[in-house]
Amino acid sequence: MPLAQLAEPWPNMELVQLDTENGQAAPEEGGNPPCKAKSDITWVEKDLVDSTDKGEGVVKEINITHHVKEGSEKADPSQFELLKVLGQGSFGKVFLVRKITPPDSNHLYAMKVLKKATLKVRDRVRTKIERDILADVNHPFVVKLHYAFQTEGKLYLILDFLRGGDLFTRLSKEVMFTEEDVKFYLAELALGLDHLHSLGIIYRDLKPENILLDEEGHIKLTDFGLSKEAIDHEKKAYSFCGTVEYMAPEVVNRQGHSHSADWWSYGVLMFEMLTGSLPFQGKDRKETMTLILKAKLGMPQFLSAEAQSLLRALFKRNPANRLGSGPDGAEEIKRHPFYSTIDWNKLYRREIKPPFKPAVGQPDDTFYFDTEFTSRTPKDSPGIPPSAGAHQLFRGFSFVATGLMEDSKVKPAQPPLHSVVQQLHGKNIQFSDGYVVKEAIGVGSYSVCKRCIHKTTNMEYAVKVIDKSKRDPSEEIEILLRYGQHPNIITLKDVYDDGKYVYLVTELMRGGELLDKILRQKFFSEREASSVLHTICKTVEYLHSQGVVHRDLKPSNILYVDESGNPESIRICDFGFAKQLRAENGLLMTPCYTANFVAPEVLKRQGYDEGCDIWSLGVLLYTMLAGCTPFANGPSDTPEEILTRIGGGKFSVNGGNWDTISDVAKDLVSKMLHVDPHQRLTAKQVLQHPWITQKDSLPQSQLNYQDVQLVKGAMAATYSALNSSKPSPQLKPIESSILAQRRVKKLPSTTL
């Protein structure tokens, strides 16, 4: 089930009272400021503080010492280029920054900047807590502090930049998942919490927006400003902090709490992930706290017995009886039957594949951060550098297009795109601000592809301009963002949306079309053809395993990124017809969800689309081997002739090149071009075929080809026939029907 909608990932936090270093409460300046009424923010309630906790404490000015990344020199603000504002809290901002000095130049970080002048004593304490904890923690599921330093007026924390956004918001908006999927995230979270507890740290602020995703989909715990360092597990903290719905009973009634309070919050998160709602939530914070202290929790019966058992063990109001509070700590959690399928060692080594991969593109993407912040120009920065200035090359896409940009006819603006695209450049940046458009390099029915030059770097790119009134490119963009990091899939560089057109910027594909290059080579062998198909099929198998079908794998959409002709430089392009497997509500589905809950007819349709991809690769393989296309003799063949041959599965593997081609190659071609899509080999089966696995034993004799233009014309005719609209049936008198005529013959003759 999708998760409930959650709070913003960067809420403004009002901390009314926090402990100072000696464990006492610090007095507030200027009386008691009112608490925020919202229940989804972090806060401290002063009127709940017992009189025994109100003694005046010793206030200490916090002086943050420098923390330097291993192998680096002492850092200062001048070493970081401000790129974007990611968020803003009550006493500081968070920026996306790029390191501009060695040894980690060009690396992206998140930088917290805290102004000393605006910090009250409680905030200074909170900052020191975060800095000390982060400096001590080194764990795969906890955010890492790389640098810490200060100037006369500011404090700086340089942290991991996590591009995936927060776990709950991403899952609630994008994907359908199962109890098995939830188990993965909870298991990683348990390891992160266990590590903090082993250092004597009580997290105390475990809530959805503090669990972030990296680009692979693994979790990272962040924001330790409310954590309490204890000498050992016998020590208790008394400050009232955290987010109310996730508070343990002993935190609410201020009896003092230890690390076991985190396991209560862990149970709240587990309940929320599995059900989409919070276990204890009243109409206001007072009622919510009453429910936490007294309410009996009903357990949803759709949860497994193991999940219900773990929740009951975590929701013990007496912390001494709570699972995880004993001397074995998190080992008690890990031994619970709910986690019987988890390999904890593999999980720690990040060897278990996450159920969901966030759609993130280039390293400086900030899709998953609030546009309220990301659209702002970073203060003290000359401006947001156009992202095409990144110091790396970006791959291009296929050449599909029309003269759209010359169309002066005004059309109504289309609805805004997927939120991912809306957030890319904020609100005011236009494509023409960063690029100069040059000549067209391809045309199509709904888009134009042109060469363009980045104004700052003078680097050449290609831009695909899509008319939104003719096609919604959201699916194409999301697929490229999520899977474009694969080495043989085009990488989306930039996206712009002016309301009428969408601009997809990629690198210019300098190597041209795959078939062009192969047919023009003086020498091309069966062994080389095997290497080419292996690279392409491996990429298609990756897409199919992610629930993505391309649906337009004609040879003109497979290109070389450079002139080398190496299989590694092959790119699958143009995902304009590609689809991701989705639930009825439009959300993506994890592999586990697909296997257990998707209707057979949906899977059958997905299998059909995958079969179409394999058929297209079969056509490509046939052409590489035979030097001609399987179903068209030339561009003059009619669609009816071509479709008849395709429908009958009629193609020849005799004569010409076929006389010297191996039998194992003929076997593979026949199985990829099988007329029944459900009987064709899958991409995985193609990769396991002897023609692929034993390529070193294949012949190296030269293959002969027809004229390049003749082959390309025949290929174009093939796909044109497939895409041509089917003629509507002509209505004729019933008497002309063969069935009616047959029935008339069977009628008994009668005489009056």
From Swiss-Prot:
Active site annotated at which positions? D205, D552
Whether Glycoprotein counts among this entry's keywords is no
What is the required cofactor set for this protein? Mg(2+)
Q: Which InterPro entries match?
A: AGC-kinase_C, Kinase-like_dom_sf, Pkinase_C, Prot_kinase_dom, Protein_kinase_ATP_BS, Ribosomal_S6_kinase_II, RSK_N, Ser/Thr_kinase_AS
Q: Which Gene3D superfamilies match?
A: Phosphorylase Kinase, domain 1, Transferase(Phosphotransferase) domain 1
Q: Which residues carry this modification: Phosphothreonine?
A: T377, T590
Q: Name one Pfam family in it.
A: Pkinase
Positions in coiled-coil regions: none
Binding residues annotated for ATP, in chain numbering: 86-94, 112, 441-449, 464
UniProt keywords (A-Z) are: ATP-binding, Kinase, Nucleotide-binding, Phosphoprotein, Repeat, Serine/threonine-protein kinase, Transferase
User: Could you say how this protein's activity is regulated?
Assistant: Activated by multiple phosphorylations on threonine and serine residues.
Tell me how the protein is altered or processed after translation.
Autophosphorylated on Ser-398, as part of the activation process.
Domain AGC-kinase C-terminal: where?
340-409
In short, the EC number is 2.7.11.1
Domain named Protein kinase: which ranges? 80-339, 435-692
Biological-process GO terms, alphabetical: positive regulation of DNA-templated transcription; TORC1 signaling
Residues recorded as bearing Phosphoserine in the entry: S239, S381, S398, S749
Q: Which reaction does it catalyse?
A: L-seryl-[protein] + ATP = O-phospho-L-seryl-[protein] + ADP + H(+); L-threonyl-[protein] + ATP = O-phospho-L-threonyl-[protein] + ADP + H(+)
The record's GO CC annotations read: cytoplasm; nucleoplasm
Function (record text): Serine/threonine kinase that may play a role in mediating the growth-factor and stress induced activation of transcription.
Q: Which family does it belong to?
A: Belongs to the protein kinase superfamily. AGC Ser/Thr protein kinase family. S6 kinase subfamily.
Q: Please state what the protein is called.
A: Ribosomal protein S6 kinase 2 alpha
| Taxonomic path | Eukaryota, Metazoa, Chordata, Craniata, Vertebrata
Which gene codes for it? RPS6KA
